[in-house]
A protein has these predicted regions:
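Aromatic- and carboxylate-enriched substrate-binding clefts and catalytic-loop regions
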Residues: 1-239, 274-276
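Catalytic core of carbohydrate-active enzymes
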Residues: 132-134, 141-142, 149-160, 173-177, ...
Length: 396
């Protein structure tokens, strides 16, 4: 992997990158490019950054020994960096992966005169803002794909959990990290489905997939192979079913996301956040509410089912099997996908026909499914992309 970012498509590999991006966009693909804010002496921009003083100085006010880190407290650094990214965005790039950022030096002097002791935690916030601002200026929205964050970074979504181990421990830690960042005020979050560090075992990949698709933003990323066809046709078909689960639920995801942004709620929320008066909800760390109506319990270990705590006083209906469960602890067998998904009694969940990409979804073809046990009517939320207005729908 070439870590030397030059903010340009290699001429020997991309004859016409602008046309390539246009062609991809016409097929429903939005391109996201990776980069980082660190520059070694091998990088073509290293001399310029040093000459113009756009880097974080060491504790003696001098050039660091190994590499330079962009200093986002310096307005000239921000201008230089946004110009590089802006050229790519104007070319047709959809988003920028804002990798790293947690490695801001503590023993350092920043352009604003403050030390690393003060600026270390603020570094990812400034980093997130710098990228989000240029994307919003050119695209009208400030979507990024960031790894590091600090208080305030929730204004610049979205963030993902970093390099998870391809183990069951890594899977469990990923679930907990998603719940933790939600409690920290972040609406949206993603993770590397299957883990990152080494090739993911197929059994783990299978269980991680439905969880990954039942988060606000889904992506597969890590040590190769991650493409499903490398695991065989049967796995590819299974991967497609997991993806289609989310695509069918896109009206639910979209409406719940809108409600989250209006109220500051996380899409992935701990049970205690939704049910603070239920003592049992405070003890559960491996389940979550996906929006206000769906409870998700990932299969963190191999098996056909798991124990699930159902909060509140209402009943719950299994999304896959239709079985009804009382609140409290239940052992629940999985349906066709290795994950437990339950719908709160009295919920109406909107669905949409599967499409090749979200651009092609037919929002005039939404259907509603009622989930009723003891309740007499069902309610749900709807938000259409064309008007962005959140509506509460009641179905007798």
């Amino acid at each position: 992997m070439d870590w030397q970012c030059d903010y340009a498509f290699a001429a020997d590999r991309f004859d016409n990158p602008r046309q390539m991006l246009t062609d991809l966009r016409s097929q429903g693909f939005r391109t996201c490019l990776w980069q980082l804010p660190y520059f070694t002496p091998k990088n073509k921009f290293f001399p310029e950054l040093v000459e113009r003083g756009l880097y974080v100085r060491n504790g003696k006010g001098q050039l660091p020994y190994e590499d330079v880190v962009l200093d986002f407290t310096n307005p000239e650094t921000v201008k230089w960096y946004q110009e590089k990214l802006g050229n790519l965005i104007e070319m047709g790039v959809g988003a920028i992966k804002v990798d790293f950022g947690e490695g801001a030096p503590l023993d350092a002097i920043y352009a604003n005169g403050r030390s690393g002791l003060y600026e270390h935690n603020l570094y990812p916030l400034r980093y997130n803002k710098t990228v989000a601002d240029i994307i919003k200026k050119l695209h009208g929205e400030n979507i990024i794909w960031a790894r590091s964050a600090w208080a305030g970074s929730q204004r610049y979504p979205l963030h993902w959990g970093g390099d998870a181990a391809t183990t069951e421990t890594g899977f469990e830690g990923t679930v907990r990290s998603g719940l933790s960042i939600g409690l920290s005020g972040f609406c949206f979050w993603s993770n590397d489905i299957g883990g990152f560090v080494t090739q993911s075992p197929e059994s783990l990949y299978r269980r991680w997939l439905p969880f990954g698709f039942l988060t606000s933003h889904s992506r597969v990323h890590g040590a190769p192979p991650t493409e499903p066809w490398y695991y065989g046709k049967e796995f590819t078909d299974y991967f497609r079913r997991c993806a289609e689960l989310k695509y069918k639920l896109m009206p639910y995801v979209y409406a719940q996301s809108k409600e989250c942004t209006e109220n500051g709620w996380p899409m992935l929320r701990t049970l205690l956040l939704e049910y603070p008066d239920d003592p049992g909800a405070w003890l559960v760390e491996d389940e979550y509410m996906f929006g206000s109506n769906l409870l998700v319990a990932p299969m963190l270990e191999e098996g056909s089912g798991r124990d699930v705590y159902l909060p509140g006083r209402q009943k719950w209906i299994d999304y896959q099997t239709g079985k009804v469960y009382a609140p409290g602890w239940n052992h629940i067998e999985c349906g066709t996908l290795p994950i437990v998904i339950l719908v709160k009694d009295g919920s109406a969940i909107p669905h949409i026909p599967v499409a090749q990409c979200t651009d092609q979804m037919k929002w005039d073809k939404i259907t509603w499914k009622k989930y009723l046990a003891d309740e007499k009517k069902a309610e749900g939320l709807l938000c259409l992309p064309q008007d962005g207005q959140l509506q509460r729908i009641s179905i007798p």
